[in-house]
């Protein structure tokens, strides 16, 4: 099975206006063809406007909104990415027909999020302000214990790191910086 790729936006890299987001994301999608994309912007007071633009960007990807089940349903997103504090919304999101990815940072959280379609597990490598990396051995161990599809996340910025996480049996890799730093954007 081909490793799935999951592009997560950050306003510092992809822009915080509709125009800059659309341009940067369109170029990254054209270059990398990610399987999934997520609009993540925890600080914007224009998230709905950005989400409307985000969901219209062409490509073969499946588009998720971060943290807002109701908006994802209203705007017709493919799914929603829930934080580790939002596991109580997994069932509601699934009932609404959304594909659900949940953020996890421990074995206990991964177990608690087992109703999600997939999880991110992080940080695998060093990532700014994300604490001590879990490392590849920990990732390999968790993929052996958890039946939920796992996206490795955190500090994945090179093709070599993607190959390393692939050997751990993950469903895919997720990254913010990989899609921006390895692109002609």
Please provide the spans of the model-predicted regions:
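Acidic-and-aromatic substrate-binding clefts and catalytic sites of carbohydrate-active enzymes
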Residues: 14-16, 44-46, 181
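Catalytic cores of alpha/beta
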Residues: 24, 63-78, 104-117, 144-179
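Glycine-rich phosphate-binding active-site loops on the catalytic face of alpha/beta enzymes
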Residues: 7, 12-13, 83-92, 118-133, ...
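Active-site mouth loops of central-metabolism enzymes
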Residues: 2-22, 99-103, 151-152, 156-157
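Short, basic/glycine-rich phosphate-binding loops at helix/coil junctions
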Residues: 1-7, 30-35, 118-122
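Glycine/Thr-rich beta-alpha phosphate-binding loop at enzyme active sites
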Residues: 75, 79-82, 101-141, 182
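Alpha-helix-loop-beta-strand connector modules within alpha/beta enzyme cores
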Residues: 48-67, 87, 92-106, 132-157
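N-terminal active-site wall of soluble small-molecule enzyme domains
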Residues: 22-96
């Amino acid at each position: 099975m081909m490793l799935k790729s999951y592009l997560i936006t950050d306003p510092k890299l992809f822009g915080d206006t509709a125009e800059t987001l659309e341009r940067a994301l369109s170029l990254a999608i054209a270059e990398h063809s990610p399987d999934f994309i997520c609009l993540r912007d925890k600080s914007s007071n224009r998230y709905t406007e950005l989400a409307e633009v985000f969901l219209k960007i062409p490509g073969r990807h499946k588009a998720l909104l971060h943290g807002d089940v109701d908006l994802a349903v209203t705007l017709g997103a493919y799914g929603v990415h829930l934080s580790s504090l939002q596991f109580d919304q997994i069932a509601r999101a699934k009932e609404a027909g959304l594909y659900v990815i949940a953020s996890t940072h421990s074995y206990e959280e991964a177990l608690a999020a087992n109703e999600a379609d997939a999880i991110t597990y992080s940080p695998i490598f060093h990532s700014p302000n994300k604490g001590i990396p879990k490392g590849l051995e920990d990732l390999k161990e968790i993929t052996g214990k958890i039946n939920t599809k796992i996206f490795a996340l955190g500090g994945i910025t090179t093709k070599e790191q993607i190959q390393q996480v692939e050997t751990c049996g993950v469903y895919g890799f997720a990254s913010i910086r990989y899609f921006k730093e390895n692109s002609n954007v």
